[in-house]
Every structure is written in structure tokens, then in C-alpha cells.
């Protein structure tokens, strides 16, 4: 699995991907036509491409053997948007990895201390809670476009890369002998 920032030319494909996932898995969760209209207007590929070009939006993609299997976008203000994972790739940690990647981007590139997301449909708040987000609204739910959502926040994170180091066996022996000497003397 490879996660990378999408190029401007790839944004239209990411929009089509997100729209197809929305239509398959999410559209039925919303009750109002207003919610559907809002989504359709938001997912205008030309507008999102322009926002990416202007530095207002960044979109990451998750790829399995060069096949797009997940997308996640974030505004330059740290608001996470467009988290979609293809149903065939659910429960493999792809959404979590995409969220980690945008949180790292928020800290390292945008110098933001926290990010936000509107968990919509509202039942997705459980998922976001499991991956480190907390409700930002005391009442829990807000009403937007006639459907409920949960505003949530999480701290942005530093990218930490641990490089494994080989420690010689003699080092462990020396540490063990030193510890034993301290214990008995």
C-alpha cells in the first residue's frame, strides 16, 4: 500500500472515485435532496482542481499496485474532507493511514497543531473516535443540510521514522553485567 499526494492532473480521477463511493455506500444515508445537492456541488472536479492548484486543498491517494483504493483531502486550514475508501478495501487500515498522512501534512507543511473533520453521516463519529478524534461540540450532533453530523478535532502529528539499529550481543552482556553489579553491590 502506497499513500502519496495526488498531482493536479489526478484530482479529477479522485473526484470520480469519491463520487462513485458516495453513490454506492453513502447516498442512501442522507435524507434530504439538499445534502445530495451540496455533495454534488462540492465534488465539482474543476473547482477542486482549481483549489489544489491555488494551494487551498491537498488530496492524498492510497494505491494498491497502482490502483486507487482510497482518497482523503484537507484544506489549508486543516479541515479534513473527502475520506473515501473503496468497499473492497475496507477494514485494512487504509482510512487510518490516509488520516495519519494528512495529520502529518498538517503539522509538517501547514504548521497546524490540530485538524478538524465533520463526521457525516453522524454514525461515522465512532470510526473517527477510534482513530484519535474527539467531538468538538458539547451537544454531539449538529444539523447541516437537514442531516446530522459531528464536528470533531484531533491533534496533528509529527512524522516519526524509526530506523532499526543492530546492537551487538556484547553490548547486552555488558549492560547485564553492569546491572547485576549494581544490584548486588
Where are these regions (language model features)?
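A short helix-loop-beta-strand connector motif used in the catalytic cores of GNAT acetyltransferases and
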Residues: 43-60, 79
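Conserved acetyl-CoA pyrophosphate-binding loop and the N-cap/start of the following alpha-helix
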Residues: 62, 89, 93-101
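A short beta-loop-alpha structural element at the N-terminal edge
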Residues: 2-17, 26-27
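Conserved GNAT acetyl-CoA-binding A-motif
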Residues: 106-120
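Conserved beta-hairpin
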Residues: 56-70
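Conserved GNAT-fold acetyl-CoA-binding loop/helix
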Residues: 19-47
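Conserved acetyl-CoA binding element of GNAT-fold acetyltransferases
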Residues: 76-88
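Conserved active-site alpha-helix within GNAT-family acetyltransferase domains
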Residues: 96, 120-138, 142
